[in-house]
């Protein structure tokens, strides 16, 4: 790299550091109550009472801002000092010992397997329940057949009407020449398919009757599966049916939709057409129309200057194009400009990210249903979830005359009336019943959905087109600091531990600005603040050093602690596994943060330190996703300390900035090699094929969110093999999240055991299924979960299969990937993407390979 390039890069990094330094400030606040709450006590942490030391300042008539700068210097010599981490943790060890004892007792008492349980059950009871089950399945089959017959009848009426219109038309010959294809009947979609329902079509060429690519679609050649998707969309349109195009992310739902509108436009129905989408995707829609259908008139109906400006823009557009064309707008504008939108007669309505309409009672779906339109199309890359109410909401939107009553729909599929008595059954019998219900209900619901839902998977239709992708799980054992926080969280002592560590770090890391104070004084100050006896102290009893320390504490730290809400145990544990600095930041001046200190707070950052620099040096571009915006701050600090130039998108980044960053990052000439993204805010409507590496710093409870994040770079347009690194801390709450992902994705090769952790198993696998659409999910207390999480943490073996047994790492080598592991993780050869490879390394497991060779 040239000297000029280096200088430019450093300028970028320094600007980023300066912006973040300005953002980190502290102020004074209310006092804090350090007494620990019960595990399930989720009340606020801030106390309204002030300590006696607070009144000390008032006594002298001066506040923090009026005092001279404080400089600490006590008289404890270094050879007389103590170790800060030498405090007695016997209470924590006692709790852990109780957990181990309970684990041993539970192991000894559980003797029978699920198979034995089932074999000893009363045979007549099992037979009776299975008979009821079969009757229920047949009942739902009847309903599916009724719906199919209704759709057939309706489509035949539309077909007959079209035939009659064509016979009376003077342009019949012209129309037949224009189409040059045989119109396909919707009955074709009711024929039995031998292929898997999810894949529907093969990657072959369409048949002779398929619609050809519209002439107005330019600068691209539709792939065979996209032509087949277009054919399906046109068939629905010609049969008077609405539909859901649910192709997996990255298969080109946008270009297929544009092709459909181009076809309709060529058939002399020139609109107006309305496309509504999330704000973040509007520019992408505009770019796609400009690229693939430049001759179609398109308006981006959006603006922040008020209704008058927007309405004038729309009226001018319609005046210019004779009331035709395509209007693209956001959900927010639909809700704001309802009257203007409703006043138009739209020929076609396309709703992008249609899965957002799953709540029938939300205002958006109510307003969209009021829009005057002849046809509706929903686009979604998220598969339909196993929830009757959500499924019916989508069906009601696209076919309101057929799916008009949820109660009737629910009656045919609600199994509660069967009285199968799941509470009194064995786990084995419940599993048998649930599996049978799921299998048959899904089959029957697919019978209903088959005519107007199309979903193709990348691994099927792009098997020979898209570059391969492989996904690893990397075990990132907690550092000593993280393990201390995690155990404290489980034992109900997180607030106290956070306070102690903040005090220690603040007074040891900022001595350049506040002077030196001994470890003994720090310990005394901690004990003083935690004693609860501050109100009994008088002036002559207070050590002058402690008084000075307390002034610094109130000025710089009190706000930090007061504002930290410790109310959600699961969230606390997940954040601890990312970094302890998510709970406090001890530096007076953020620019003083060192790489060494930052790495001590996070085993995951230690893995990045070993893994990412070699990738950057080889020219790879990396996407790093996190669930937590404040974790993105720390990762950005880590990038700055390594002189990596970064872009960033989270919920606070405006649309124009997003667009500019995406364009630059996807350019091969741009020097930014890492893109930091908030998983939820940046998981949709973003194309980042400039990257070939994805890091999931933490996983989402919904595995589809993580898959969408990967699809930002593993999509059409990607030319390089892709590698995904999923960072995970074994035998912690992340183990539960990973179990959920593996289960939902049906990854049989990745066997993840939950053993005796029944409540954690329920938490991992519960998803509000078809079977209990409106029932509460897992009903266990925090105490039950804490107990099992403690047992999981103390397990001697890894439940995922890592060699080193979860957290039982040697802390001297914690987070250290071996050279062999780094070689495996960075291997881009085609050999590394072969299917069914076995990767057996201490910290690394191969989770999944797609489009494998």
UniProtKB/Swiss-Prot annotation:
DEGH box, short sequence motif: residues: 352-355
Ranges of residues in domain Helicase ATP-binding: 234-401
GO MF entry, a single one: nucleosome array spacer activity
First-listed, main subcellular location of the protein, grouped into a coarse class: nucleus
UniProt cross-references to InterPro entries, sorted A to Z: Helicase_ATP-bd, Helicase_C-like, HELLS_N, P-loop_NTPase, SNF2-like_sf, SNF2/RAD54-like_C, SNF2_N
Keywords: ATP-binding, Coiled coil, DNA-binding, Helicase, Hydrolase, Nucleotide-binding, Nucleus
SUPFAM superfamilies for this protein: P-loop containing nucleoside triphosphate hydrolases
CDD domains documented for this protein: DEXHc_HELLS_SMARCA6 (cd18009), SF2_C_SNF (cd18793)
Gene of this entry: IRC5
Protein name stated in the entry: Uncharacterized ATP-dependent helicase IRC5
Coiled coil residues, start to end: 548-580
Subcellular location: Nucleus
Region span, Disordered: 43-71, 158-207
Cellular-component GO terms for this entry: chromatin; nucleus
Record function comment: Is probably involved in a pathway contributing to genomic integrity.
Binding site for ATP: 247-254
Disruption phenotype: Displays increased levels of spontaneous RAD52 foci in proliferating diploid cells.
E.C. designation(s): 3.6.4.-
Bias (Basic and acidic residues) ranges: 56-65, 185-198
Positions of the Helicase C-terminal domain: 607-758
């Amino acid at each position: 790299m040239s000297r000029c390039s280096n200088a430019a890069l450093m300028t970028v990094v320094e600007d980023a550091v300066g912006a973040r330094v300005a953002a980190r400030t502290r102020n004074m606040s209310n006092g804090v109550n350090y007494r620990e709450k019960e595990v399930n006590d989720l009340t606020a942490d801030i106390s309204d009472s002030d300590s006696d030391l607070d009144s000390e300042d008032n006594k002298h008539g001066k506040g923090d801002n009026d005092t001279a700068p404080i400089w600490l210097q006590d008289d404890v010599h270094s050879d007389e000092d103590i170790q800060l981490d030498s405090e007695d943790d016997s209470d924590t060890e006692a709790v852990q010992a109780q957990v181990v004892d309970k684990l041993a007792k539970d192991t000894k008492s559980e003797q029978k397997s699920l198979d034995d349980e089932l074999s000893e059950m009363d045979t007549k009871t099992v037979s009776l329940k299975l008979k009821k089950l079969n009757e229920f399945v047949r009942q739902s089959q009847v309903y599916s057949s009724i719906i199919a017959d209704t759709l057939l009848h309706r489509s035949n009426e539309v077909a007959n009407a079209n035939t009659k219109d064509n016979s009376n038309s003077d342009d019949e010959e012209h129309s037949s020449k224009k189409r040059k294809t045989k119109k396909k009947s919707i009955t074709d979609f009711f024929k039995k398919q031998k292929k898997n329902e999810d894949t529907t079509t093969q990657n072959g060429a369409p048949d002779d009757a398929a619609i050809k690519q519209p002439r107005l679609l330019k600068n691209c050649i539709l792939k065979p599966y996209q032509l087949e998707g277009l054919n399906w969309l046109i068939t629905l349109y010609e049969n008077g049916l609405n539909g859901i195009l649910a192709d997996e992310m990255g298969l080109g739902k946008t270009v297929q939709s544009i092709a459909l509108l181009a076809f309709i436009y060529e058939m002399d129905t020139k609109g107006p057409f309305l496309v509504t989408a999330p704000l973040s995707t509007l520019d992408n829609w505009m770019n796609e129309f400009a690229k693939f259908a430049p001759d179609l008139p398109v308006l981006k109906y959006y603006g922040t200057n008020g209704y008058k400006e927007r309405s004038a823009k729309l009226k001018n557009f319609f005046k210019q194009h004779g009331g035709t064309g395509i209007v693209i707008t956001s959900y927010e504008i639909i809700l704001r400009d309802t009257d203007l939108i409703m006043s138009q007669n739209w020929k076609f309505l396309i709703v992008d990210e249609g899965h957002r309409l799953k709540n029938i009672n939300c205002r958006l779906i109510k307003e969209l249903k009021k829009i005057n339109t002849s046809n509706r199309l929903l686009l979604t890359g998220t598969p339909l979830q196993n929830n009757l109410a959500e499924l019916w909401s989508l069906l009601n939107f696209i076919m309101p005359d057929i799916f008009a009553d949820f109660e009737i729909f629910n009656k045919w599929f609600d199994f509660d009336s069967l009285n199968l008595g799941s509470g009194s059954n064995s786990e084995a019998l419940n599993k048998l019943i649930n599996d049978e219900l799921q299998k048959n209900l899904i089959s029957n619901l697919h019978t209903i959905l088959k005519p107007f839902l199309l979903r193709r998977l990348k691994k099927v239709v792009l098997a020979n087109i898209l570059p391969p992708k492989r996904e690893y799980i990397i075990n990132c054992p907690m550092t000593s600091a993280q393990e201390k926080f995690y155990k404290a969280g489980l034992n109900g002592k997180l607030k106290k531990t956070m306070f102690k560590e903040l005090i220690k770090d603040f007074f040891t890391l900022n001595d350049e600005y506040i002077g030196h104070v001994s470890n003994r004084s720090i310990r005394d100050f901690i004990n003083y603040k935690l004693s609860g006896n501050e109100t009994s102290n008088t002036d002559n009893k207070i050590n002058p050093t402690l008084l000075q320390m307390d002034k610094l504490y109130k000025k710089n730290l009190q706000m930090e602690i007061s504002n930290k809400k410790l109310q959600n145990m699961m969230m606390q544990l997940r954040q601890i596994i990312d970094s302890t600095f998510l709970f406090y930041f001890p530096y007076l001046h953020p620019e003083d943060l060192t790489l060494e200190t930052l790495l001590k707070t996070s085993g995951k950052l230690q893995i990045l330190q070993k893994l990412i620099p070699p990738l950057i040096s080889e020219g790879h571009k990396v996407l790093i996703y996190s669930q937590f915006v404040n974790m993105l701050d720390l990762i950005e600090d880590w990038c700055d300390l390594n002189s990596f130039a970064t872009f960033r998108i989270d919920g606070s980044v405006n649309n124009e900035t997003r667009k500019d960053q995406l364009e630059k990052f996807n350019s091969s000439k741009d020097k930014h090699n890492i893109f930091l993204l908030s998983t939820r805010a940046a998981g949709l409507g973003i194309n980042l094929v400039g990257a070939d590496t994805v890091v999931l710093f933490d996983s989402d409870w919904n595995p589809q969110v993580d898959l969408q994040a990967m699809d930002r770079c593993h999509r059409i347009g990607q030319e390089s093999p892709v590698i995904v690194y999923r960072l995970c801390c074994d035998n912690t709450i992340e183990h539960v999240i990973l179990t959920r992902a593996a289960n939902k994705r049906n990854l049989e090769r990745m066997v993840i055991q939950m053993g005796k952790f029944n409540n954690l198993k329920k938490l991992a696998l519960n998803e509000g299924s078809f079977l209990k659409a409106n029932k509460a999910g897992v009903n266990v207390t925090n105490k039950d979960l804490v107990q099992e999480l403690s047992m999981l943490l103390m397990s001697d073996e890894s439940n995922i299969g890592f060699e080193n047994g979860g957290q039982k790492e040697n802390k001297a080598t914690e987070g250290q990937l071996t050279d062999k592991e780094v070689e495996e993780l960075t291997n881009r050869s085609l050999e590394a993407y072969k299917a069914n490879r076995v990767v057996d390394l201490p910290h690394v497991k191969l989770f999944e390979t797609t489009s494998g060779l």
